[in-house]
Amino acid sequence: MPPMTPTQVLPDAVRDLGRVHHIALIVRSIEASLGLWRDALHLDLETVMDIPDDRVRIAFLGVGESKIELVEPTDDSTGVARFLEKAGEGFHHVCFEVANLAETLLRLEIDGIELIDSSPRRGAEGPVAFIHPRSCHGVLVELIEAPGGPAWASLGF
């Protein structure tokens, strides 16, 4: 029998991604964007909030079991603002829910996946971490821990 790879040694729950939590779009103005997403497409506006540490303003709109996140930069010197200037409005990242974020990050690191965040950090809706686009065919991937997971208490949620 061939030796097990590091991924095979870990529990199934660590290997499996959950649902798509949200798709994030970069916009110049959340208010202007709500004319489409909330008013024309009738998505439910769940929240609008400032994230001072990231220098962005965000809005979440519910769609089925997932969400659309609108991200508006509040400072022209941020990576989000530079992305908006270079690429224009549109797709920014996809976010998947995982049961245990720290274990998932460890598994990804063992598998040689380039991470932006090697440990969970506070996000707007729970513990999050990002995978570098170089490891994901040019797509920025966010992971968010499912409610009640181990990182929630350690990050003060």
Identify the residue ranges that each predicted region occupies.
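Vicinal oxygen chelate
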Residues: 2-14, 27-35, 59-60, 69, 74-75, 86-157
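Long, hydrophobic N-terminal alpha-helical segment
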Residues: 5-56
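Short, flexible, solvent-exposed loop/turn segments with mixed acidic/basic and small polar residues
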Residues: 11-14, 81-86
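Short, structured motif recognition centered on aromatic/hydrophobic residues
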Residues: 20-27, 37, 61, 68-71, ...
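Short loop/beta submotifs within extracellular cysteine-rich repeat domains
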Residues: 33, 44, 68, 76-79, ...
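C-terminal "cap" of GNAT-fold acetyltransferases
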Residues: 51-67
